[in-house]
Amino acid sequence: MAREMTILGSAVLTLLLAGYLAQQYLPLPTPKVIGIDLGTTYCSVGVFFPGTGKVKVIPDENGHISIPSMVSFTDNDVYVGYESVELADSNPQNTIYDAKRFIGKIFTPEELEAEIGRYPFKVLNKNGMVEFSVTSNETITVSPEYVGSRLLLKLKEMAEAYLGMPVANAVISVPAEFDLKQRNSTIEAANLAGLKILRVINEPTAAAMAYGLHKADVFHVLVIDLGGGTLDVSLLNKQGGMFLTRAMSGNNKLGGQDFNQRLLQYLYKQIYQTYGFVPSRKEEIHRLRQSVEMVKLNLTLHQSAQLSALLTVEEQDRKEPHSSDTELPKDKLSSADDHRVNSGFGRGLSDKKSGESQVLFETEISRKLFDTLNEDLFQKILVPIQQVLKEGHLEKTEIDEVVLVGGSTRIPRIRQVIQEFFGKDPNTSVDPDLAVVTGVAIQAGIDGGSWPLQVSALEIPNKHLQKTNFN
């Protein structure tokens, strides 16, 4: 008996040693399942590497780790992501964005009428569902699922180029409030892109996984997701590795675009007061918007940022500079106050070829000014937070962990507003832009059987869950 036990022990040790040596010296297996964050404004793809337990968010051919959720249709081709952004000004009626807002969703006529007016492309009502009308060589209609499939195909190709092998399986995230039809429509979009979806995971749950909360000893988790166009607040209850979304609230018309718009309106007024005209050329408006975005990003790290823009003055429209209290004329507001139209890429008037001169507009924007322009919007973030606490029958002191998701949560004043409300710092240990895709990639690794083994997140369906929107 002792001899048999010795042999058995030696065999176990041999297996353990072989496993250790294999883990140390053999090439790591390539991930076979990708994780996808199909966002409203940006989307991204990541993989979980067996052995190391690391997540890699995969860049595109130009090094971007996320791509704009935009698709442009032309006579020659269909362009996706940053290539689509370049066409947004010259081809706005055929450049589709915000498709995620419409995928699998049934609208009332009143709801759809309100949505139609927000976009430069044609939004059609097909029995309460949305289709988009685009004109390339001919006028065609495309569904939100098809637009989503083009984005997913691009992400799939990025993953295949990085991994050096075909990819067929994926895990994908969706908003927690998506119903079964919206989830199935998202799966349909993935199928059109040649992907089999192994699992659909809620975005707040994915974010919590990225922060490691599926393995942590916490119970009440509040996820604040503030991106380019929307705010979503979710209250999660966690027991072991199981997550229950207990309450949701948000604002579908609050995000980084709105903060940019406040600064852009301020700049238009400054230009009018200084030079007596308002920029109307679409390429100049586009450059101004890009400059505003860069200033906003710089202000997350610095107390001030420099903005400069080369502007064309059409002499026949130029007036004497105005005093600082002069209001921008109503007829000049069309381009400056084009609120949230064309996803922040601007629209202009026809170009003129004669009687022109150029001026270099330069100004310094302080963080204090940016915060002052947006303070009322920053305070609106607290409204859905208070709502989910009310629906969850919790005091703010009972929240164990506050998790930040989305690029707009980088803004220092927003973090301060949240910190002051809860009386403690939010968890900022994960890049908020990549929190969801990181969590989805971890789940993809789990579903792909990667090692070291991770604790999977089990989501408990909540059939009574409804999202309260403050738009």
UniProtKB/Swiss-Prot annotation:
UniProt lists compositionally biased (Basic and acidic residues) regions at: 315-341
Q: Which UniProt keywords apply?
A: ATP-binding, Endoplasmic reticulum, Microsome, Nucleotide-binding, Signal
Sorted alphabetically, which PROSITE patterns does this protein's record hold? HSP70_1, HSP70_2, HSP70_3
Q: Which organism is it from?
A: Pongo abelii
Which family does the record assign?
Belongs to the heat shock protein 70 family.
Listed GO MF terms: ATP binding; ATP-dependent protein folding chaperone
Q: What does this protein do?
A: Has peptide-independent ATPase activity.
Relate the assembly described in the record.
Binds UBQLN2.
Instruction: List the protein's name.
Output: Heat shock 70 kDa protein 13
InterPro entries, sorted: ATPase_NBD (IPR043129), Heat_shock_70_CS (IPR018181), Hsp_70_fam (IPR013126), HSPA13 (IPR042048)
Q: Where is this region: Disordered?
A: 314-352
Q: Provide the leader sequence positions.
A: 1-22
Q: What is its main location?
A: other
| UniProt KW Nucleotide-binding keyword | yes
GO cellular component assignments: endoplasmic reticulum
Q: What subcellular locations does the record give?
A: Microsome; Endoplasmic reticulum
